[in-house]
Design a protein with these regions (language model features):
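An alpha-helical, amphipathic repeat domain used for nucleic-acid recognition
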Residues: 1-94
Length: 94
């Protein structure tokens, strides 16, 4: 039996969900968009929230990329693999 689809989150609830995700680790804008889209009441709310997070510097693709690369270097991943993974997360190769 299928579970009923939950009601969309208000803007405030959506912000709390985003902050909860960002409190665990940095996320790219695209990652947040993919994770929050099913919960958002509208695409406009989600876009406004992502802009707000970037303006407040709570979310930064640059900071995400630096953290991501550092973690992958320690795992021994090569530059081509890291570039591919970054592109899949919505961050251009540096």
């Amino acid at each position: 039996m299928k579970k009923p689809k939950p009601d969309p989150l208000t803007y405030s609830e959506l912000r709390c969900a985003a902050v909860d995700l960002l409190s665990r680790r940095d996320h790219s804008r695209l990652e947040l968009q993919r994770k929050l889209r099913p919960k958002a009441a509208s695409a406009e709310d989600l876009d406004n929230l992502l802009n707000e997070l970037a303006e407040r510097r709570w979310q930064s693709d640059e900071r995400f990329a630096e953290s991501f690369v550092n973690s992958r270097v320690h795992r021994g991943h090569g530059p081509l693999r890291m570039q591919h993974e970054l592109r899949s997360k919505g961050v251009g190769a540096a």
